[in-house]
Amino acid sequence: AGLLRSDPPDRYVFNYRASYAEETAATVNYLVKVKRLKPSQIAVFAQQDAYGDAGFSGVARAIRALGGDENSILRLHYQRNTVDVDDAVDQLRKSRVPIRAVVMVPGYRAAAKFIEKTRDLFPGMIYTSVSFVGSTALANELMLLGKKYASGVIVTQVVPALDGHSSLVLDYKAALAKYFPGEQPDYVSLEGYVAANVLITALRRNGPDLDTEKLVTTLENLRDLDIGLGTPVSFGRSEHQGVHKVWGTQIDENGRYQPIDLQ
């Protein structure tokens, strides 16, 4: 959340992962540079709160950097803790500019309802969402509606693909199977595993003589830490975010997430 990402950073707050703004910025770059869409063809469907604002700011920043007009972005709203997406659907239908992709910053039920109500109206639409949506919950909800609603939906992630072979993902799966044999791997628990891994590394480096200030100093001196992500984790006195990388995944016709290259 933006509240926990002050600049300069709060001394006692460290974030492992990329921000929602970084996720949506990566999505816009993918849509423009890989899918060859014009910035004007991208809309945003976002919750009306700080979470939605954070995602929208990433889209606006990326579109500005690509030479587009951030002030003309079609922003589709819905109220937090609801699935009332009718106004957003109407706005999309009335848009004078043909929209080819919607970057979503939602909860999973609202995302599914929005896709359900617009998929047939815009069969070629590209739908993307940030990781907060809950990848498993979104895929399950869409598959209940039918394969055509789920297939092709893109979700950005802040950890590597679950079906990949990075050493950290393999370690995570082994630990999950050992300690929680009834649980299935998912992106939410993998993110927690990664964050805990970083903290444990800092605790070990700090040693037994531990207090808050010493732990903060140890974290701020973590540089190029390799925990098997495929990208290093680094902090500093003015940098309390360890990783800025965003990974791409896409739901296939069986409701499973497949990795995609965002660049």
Label the predicted regions.
Residues A1-R75, I126-S151:
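Extracytoplasmic ligand/sensor domains, especially the bilobed periplasmic-binding protein
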Residues D7-D10, A18, I115-G192, W247, ...:
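Extracellular/periplasmic periplasmic-binding protein-like sensory domains
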Residues D10-A18, A46-D49, R75-Y78, I99-R100, ...:
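Second-shell loop/turn segments in exported
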Residues E23, G55, A110, L168, ...:
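Catalytic-loop motifs flanking and including active-site residues across diverse enzymes
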Residues E23-V28, H77-R93, A111:
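Structural motif
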Residues N29-L37, A60-G68, R93-V97, E116-P123, ...:
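Sec-exported extracytoplasmic/periplasmic mature domains
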Residues Q41-A46, V97-Y108, F114, M125-S131, ...:
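Periplasmic-binding protein-like
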Residues L176-L190, I200-R256:
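Segments of small-molecule ligand-sensing domains
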